[in-house]
């Protein structure tokens, strides 16, 4: 408590005793205190270097919202991963693609993915299917993959490796035309992969909402301009914030790629979190322009994208 107090954090809505219990039972110091980066500090006077209008209750609230956000995002990313895998396998079948050839060429080009398959053989739930379609020597080296069809690669690969296979096949089969489609744009999908990994590893996503150096893919920036009421300058500034850029990209790809049945349920959850739960204790953030402007920007994108959901 002394460390937070020395930095200007108050305990008006949650007492110090309650805060101590919170750290013992619900969360640790680092994962709670990290959100202080979203608050301004005094730059002069006796309180120089101390936070302005930062109560412990605000840190707790952001922590709770971040947790709920991560849970939802993991499911949305899984929906996108599923949709991409279905679309690629369907493409193979509809066009009678000899997928054995593409699997062989892919693994010859991406050596590290062969090593990942070896690791999955030893640790994952895919070991039976891996043993059926791949051959290993006595040292557990992958030596033959000629009997592996495309659908098996789609099934066993982790999301990041799958994206490499996905874009390899798209490039080989269709050329670069697909790059104009946001749901098949490599930069956009890798932003989603990064967000998925961060949520899956339980990282604090809302740790810092200040503008930084992230550069949005052109297709993302153009789509946001089409859907948002904000000026281009504001959009460009907000999209330099990594958590905002990744989430906005997720929203745009999700809308375009995921089936209507799945989308209807998930967007209902999304709106419940952003348009209701996040507003529940909004009064404690009314003096924080960074948090308010970030929320309103995201709210605008959600409403502009899912008007009919």
Identify the residue ranges that each predicted region occupies.
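Extended intrinsically disordered or low-complexity regions, especially N/C-terminal cytosolic tails and loops
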Residues: 1-194, 206-309
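Acidic/aromatic/glycine-rich contiguous surface patches that form carbohydrate-binding/processing clefts
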Residues: 202
